[in-house]
Each structure stands twice: as structure tokens, then as C-alpha cells.
Amino acid sequence: MKTPRPLPYHVVPCNEHEGKGMADWNEGYVTDVAYTFGYYSELNPLRSKLALLNRRLHCPDFQTGCELGFGQGVSVNIHAAAGPATWVGTDFNPAHAAFAQELSVAANLGARLFDDSFEQFAARDDLPDFDYIG
């Protein structure tokens, strides 16, 4: 049996998890299994626009998009690269968030990607009003 190759990301310690016991920091979320590196076209805001246009409804342009639970961040970073909108998102797994942040920085996309829980993310006071949430 071959030895598996290490995954292409590193874990960045997250200060927000300090003080919580090891048994409860993840709040039941599975964090010991890496998510896939896939692109999910269902999250593409242009698909929503197409559906509205097919019904002869106007779809306004959007300036700010959000992806909740972005996994490795492939989709959110592709969307950030594909248009002028500002993208923000969160994934509870610190390793996933770190990899997604590295993608954004490497491509100079400016996406703001966090490793917050949904509760922490919703409580942030530095988020814009989102035009699109996927």
C-alpha cells in the first residue's frame, strides 16, 4: 500500500479557538477529514442570473458575494477572479480556510476568507451587506 502524499496546505493556528477544550472547539463539525478541491458551478452567481433571465426577470449586477462553508476555497476564488465583485466567506475548518486564503493571495484576488463558525461570522461587524450568498 502506498503512503499517501501530504495535502498541499498547512494548518494556521486560529487564536479564536484558544480557550476552548479540544473536545468542543469544533462544535461537532468534522475537521479531521480534508474536503475535496472541486469547483461547484451551482454556487456560481451567473447560474442564478440565467434562471431569472429565462423567466424574463431582471437580475441586477452584484457587488458583494459571500460563500458559506467554502471548503478548500476553489469556487469562491474562481468567482473572485471572474468578476469585479468583492467576495467574502467562511469555512469552519482552519486548514481549509488557510488554503483558500493562500489561493486568494497567490492570485491577488482580495477575497476575505475566514475560519469562523457561522455564528461568529454573522456576529462580525466588518462585513458588508451581501448581494449574493451561496
Place the predicted regions along the sequence by residue.
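Conserved SAM-binding loop
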Residues: 100-101
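Conserved class I S-adenosyl-L-methionine
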Residues: 62-71
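Conserved SAM-binding motif I beta-strand of class I
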Residues: 86-91
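Conserved alpha-helix/loop element of class I SAM-dependent methyltransferases that forms part
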Residues: 32-63
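A short acidic, Gly/Pro-enriched loop at the edge of an enzyme's catalytic core
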Residues: 124-132
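Conserved short alpha-helix immediately C-terminal to the canonical SAM/SAH-binding motif I
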Residues: 95-96
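Conserved SAM-binding loop of SAM-dependent methyltransferases across substrates and taxa
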Residues: 72-84
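Conserved SAM-binding strand-loop segment of SAM-dependent methyltransferases
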Residues: 108-120
